[in-house]
């Protein structure tokens, strides 16, 4: 355990930390010990002090723990497994889905449903093993050998594969209960880091500690103090205390470094207190010291607490391997060794294999799975196993396996299933659980406590990022003000009846649909919540419940601010009871519809699934409120929609609230005007529905009864119905959250374009995780691809580089006077602890930073960097970001075509890509689709592609690589270094950050730049043979000698005190600055600066290149037209290969159009019917919101790839990016317009209105053109909105706000004549004004109108016939009589022609082409505005040259 080392105490910290967490699970304070919860600041037990000693803290916790064992029984969990077989189901047609072939998938699903058998893929075969409580198992094997599947199986996470029913797994006497009752006792920690990005590290870990805090807490502290202390201890142990107030971040939101984020994930899992822990490559991204420290932590936890750990490691330092008790070696899903780590190497040596010098045991064991790496002893060539099956057979025949079976048998006898240990574990869990928690629950806290804790986290998240909430409140208040000003101070007479209905309709919709964007945030956080559920921290429904409560203050504020403005400015019923009822109903509707959106999100597994159906549902809810289609006009087959629609009940109640028991003076009588001045009340009638001859007013109850068939007695009944819906939807939401998980990938299977040769070959049964298997080195013929790689001559140097960034109010120096150079034909390693600034230095040197202040001197051949620098360098980032729909070859060709010099012929660039593919050994999967992690290329293949994309660009200066071996096993890491070696030998200059290099790997670097925390240089110089130059430097300056068997890369981290527990009294930064090596570096930098410009100028002169082509200094290699062409082709390809996106867009357009069309099927041309047809157009436009919600996330994903990788590499310009993304939507939306037109225009029956004038074809074409411009406007408007915003949610909020303004001012809800003068300009600038006017005039002009029975106005003539009595009025005002010869009870219809209705809403068929032209003006404006906004907000400005500091 290296306890004699000076670093021993601290190095145990992490172990102790785990230990501590377990200790606190079961503890009572012993008076003899010191209470670690009540210590002096700065003491050895204070995790926030400099002198914190993990071992001392651990001992103190141990003393507290040993008191009351009944209250805190120790909980351990081992596992034995035998005959363990795991399989998945695959298909021979692993082809890429596209818009054209996705139907074949439907056919295959149908055939599966009818019993066609799928191909079974064996993942794990005949596994046997035993890991007892307190033991550690290391799982070794290359990526795709089944390591992850094995760990997931042990932890009970079997989504996507099947454990054979005859498999035997015994968790110390427990079997079937593990998955549910004891979930959280065995946990699986995945390789990826999933956290709330805007939450701080401190809050993230406090939450985990509090969620598993035991009922009985030692030391006299409460749960909050306990959780805070545990958080501080674990952060101190993992060396992340300094990140406490920094947000965690993710790949796109800047937070802590990648290594620090990995340690946050480890710390969070540790705080879950699980007695059986499965860690899947959890050291990925950690330096060697932290990786070893992690294993030490697990070792101490196992020794003292009896915790069991199963860990897969892809690059295991020898020191880390030595902490494990047992090893499992997997070879393509077969077990080829299981036993003591100390005996594993000898087992294979005895078989006839040789372990090369300085190869670690773990690397040697893993090398057994590769025929290219394993070395056979002379004379054993024919006797050693070669295939996975042969290795497995040799293992099954071995005495070690016989002993293992005997041990498993004894274990199963000792821990019989459902025996006494099951009761012991239940008692132990019960002692920890809150009193209110069920015994059979896997959770520690009670449900109420879980909700409270999630509420606390919700508040922290809101504080960290209130932008969406604030923008929502602001947007809704603006909308309310706008609507209120349109309907300002409505008169209390009959002239405002329609306006009051329209106002209440809009108020209901605004309150009901304002929370639609909640769906987006629910999908974003789903993966995090499911991980916490697997750790048994809380029920997903507890988080759901807390988020409902967390949103209440916002909803209350929103209801008050929006509705007060709306109610009083518009002069709705000025009575206290009516006002409070209005606000109350609006608020209850908001809550109910929030539950509707949330339940929609929880019932579907992805946003793409949910959007089309939720859009149609929303359309249904909006149309069937009772306003756009009054109850009497609802068709029989669809009337039930109103009964299940909560909004319709709210609208009815608000209408009753406004009109009940009120009489409204009549403002317009029929007949009236010249000749009708002195009429009695019986001889004229109010021209409003619900009027009664002889009355000078209209009763409100009569009006709503006649127009809407509403009854006053329903007012409070409806509120009860809305509440019932609210509780029902809330229950659906909470239950679905607990049971329906997000869409997961099923394992890494290579996907090829349909028809590719790889699909025609019979596949071998590979590991499901792997698909096409590891990319083994293929024997090459002839050239290995090096001949085409340009030999470089430029020298890159930097001096006194500093980088400062503002975090909060303080300035923090990330890099501190860093010097160095990279020369052609050299491989330079950049190393340091996690968070030392390695990636930041690469970003600064590669001109990739967008924030912060850079100072110092960065030169190429003694000259400052020019505009072309970024495209002349290659930068392989740590994150493997690629376009998921492209193939490997397409990705490489895209890079080559756009980044290689324009003078290179196209065919030569494509040939060069073929050479790169050979060089990188990617021939097997060159035409495979990249896919997303899990479905497509595996980790190693992605990493090769990342490097390949940069090589394809033919970088003329140098190649930067950030963690090229991160997450890869030792074999693949070696292959990557082989590749770098090839490049180096051909003159490539390479600067590469690296974590966890083995001694053999480290030896392959020529030079090392070594940074300590704070971005300070510790060493820059040659590594030397066997790292001797490096070792001599540190020993000479006071470091301890390097043991012969030690890995120098790990040793030097210990020497400078960079390992979490190590300590040094030497200031290595100052030592370096005072060393002769530093002086020589400064001299050489000055020499390079002085001589290189002269040498390069001489070279240019002698080679007849006195004036280099201007093109080589351009910012982009390819001209703009070539950029646009290539990018456009790629985006079209991507859309074609995204069938889900296209078909969800199709479903949205077709289903919405059909729904509106058939809801208003063949609507008659009555007064209400004409209004319904107008609302048919109005409701069709409401799909606008869903259309832009579909486009925005798609665009954000594209933009992330462009801004994170392609823009910094100067692959193509922002103009090509934004234009191609706008253009690609236009053809698809043109196709959608045809479908939408056909599904809407004909069912609604508008074509019949063109028959009298024989213009059916012309007006049909005109209507399609208007629908077409609507969809083109929608897509360009979506890009206009999202161009500047980071988040689709914020852009969606603003887009919805502007969409509502367009809708409000289009002339439907309030005609131009009814608008206040101030708002006339909005009527004129709203695109929907011209759209609705054009569609309405084309749809209903130049035909006759009639009245329905309840629309006729009835009165008695003064004398004579009705015709004679009304003759003068009809000639002036229009209209017709039902029976002109009647002498009493005249039935008069005020409208005879549809053009009269059109003129009332300021629409005219003569303006159709003007309206069409104006829509194109708006479309073009959107495109220009999107480009301008993107340039203004998101394109980095040209920075000043780097300042030189002395």
UniProtKB/Swiss-Prot annotation:
Its main location: membrane. SMART domains: AAA. The chain crosses the membrane at residues 468-488, 502-522, 548-568, 577-597, 610-630, 719-739, 1147-1167, 1177-1197, 1217-1237, 1265-1285, 1301-1321, 1412-1432. Residues 104-357, 796-1038 form the ABC transporter domain. The keyword Transcription regulation does not apply. It is found in: Cell membrane. CDD domains: ABCG_PDR_domain1 (cd03233), ABCG_PDR_domain2 (cd03232). SUPFAM superfamilies: P-loop containing nucleoside triphosphate hydrolases. GO terms for cellular component: plasma membrane. Glycans are attached at residues 9, 28, 222, 281, 305, 1344, 1359. Keywords: ATP-binding, Cell membrane, Glycoprotein, Membrane, Nucleotide-binding, Transmembrane, Transmembrane helix, Transport. It is a multi-pass membrane protein. GO terms for molecular function: ABC-type transporter activity; ATP binding; ATP hydrolysis activity. Pfam families: ABC2_membrane, ABC2_membrane_7, ABC_tran, ABC_trans_N, PDR_CDR. ATP binds at residues 832-839. Signal peptide: none annotated. The keyword 4Fe-4S does not apply. Belongs to the ABC transporter superfamily. ABCG family. PDR (TC 3.A.1.205) subfamily. ABC-type transporter; part of the gene cluster that mediates the biosynthesis of the sesterterpenes ophiobolins, fungal phytotoxins with potential anti-cancer activities. Acts as a specific transporter involved in ophiobolins secretion. This is ABC-type transporter oblD. It comes from Aspergillus clavatus (strain ATCC 1007 / CBS 513.65 / DSM 816 / NCTC 3887 / NRRL 1 / QM 1276 / 107). The gene is oblD.
